[in-house]
Amino acid sequence: MSLLVIGATGTLGRQIVRRALDEGYEVSCLVRNLRKAYFLKEWGAELLYGDLSLPETLPTNLTKITAIIDASTARPSDPYKAEKIDLEGKIALVEAAKVAGIKRFVFFSVLNAQNYRHLPLVNLKCRMEEYLQTSELEYTTFQLSGFFQGLISQYAIPILEKQTIWITGEYTKINYIDTNDIAKFAVRSLSLNGTIKRTIPLVGLKSWNSEEIIQLCERLSGQKANITKIPLQLLVFFKYLTGFFEWTTNISERLAFAEVLNARQDITSEMASTYSQFGFEPNDITSLESYMQDYFGRILRRLKELSDERERTL
């Protein structure tokens, strides 16, 4: 089977590429910056130029592709509204897949998306889910909650660098998952007929709130976090303020997620049936504790090595 990965240079996309290559798939990657994506070519993937914000750049000759995994999303820094990528670009991609005769399509959405449809970014995910459901494609939609990898910049690095961590004192717990594990499920789904035209929740082993994650990072790093709590109302104010300017629209839409954290409704799902369907066990899934332990272990070892090198040069 030959696979086309969209968003292949991103946090999730690159793990999907690596996993698919390891399992023997022929992998092509649709990228908008060939130079930045060169590492994917070194891994063994083929690079194709294309930009979802410019549908006319999508390749017209995709006949050798048998499946598409779309891990793309708009960035906060993009100079256009998220809809240009997360809806219009994806619809153009699906239409290109139909023309090429590609049936299999894997998409990533947000867990319990219908509950948060008032949020602009989630609404785009809902609309894309609905579009796929009315299409002729053999789609699989994975609904995700959050990535371990995003917690590094949010909590781990600020603690190590003694920077302030801003939290809202939220009540909601989120069941984060490692992108490596998401990649395992995504690639496995291509060989399971039972996943066709299905929406599947995909979460980790345990739900966490911000304070619990900070406590874990403090214990593993041996350092105390500098925490500042800010009222949720202040973030809501910034959301509306940034919404006034076109160049801050994406930032405003992401600030809207802060309102979810005070909803007192945990973002999680039961996974037993999913494990059974995919042939995985809970032991096959990485826990946040082991992920963070590995991260801090590597960083602290490196810091010790640098300290030893400085002492030897004195």
From Swiss-Prot:
Pfam families: NmrA. One of its GO terms (molecular function) is oxidoreductase activity. It is found in: Plastid, Chloroplast. GO terms for cellular component: chloroplast; photosystem II. It comes from the Eukaryota. Coiled coil: none annotated. GO terms for biological process: photosynthesis. This is Photosystem II assembly factor Ycf39. The gene is ycf39.
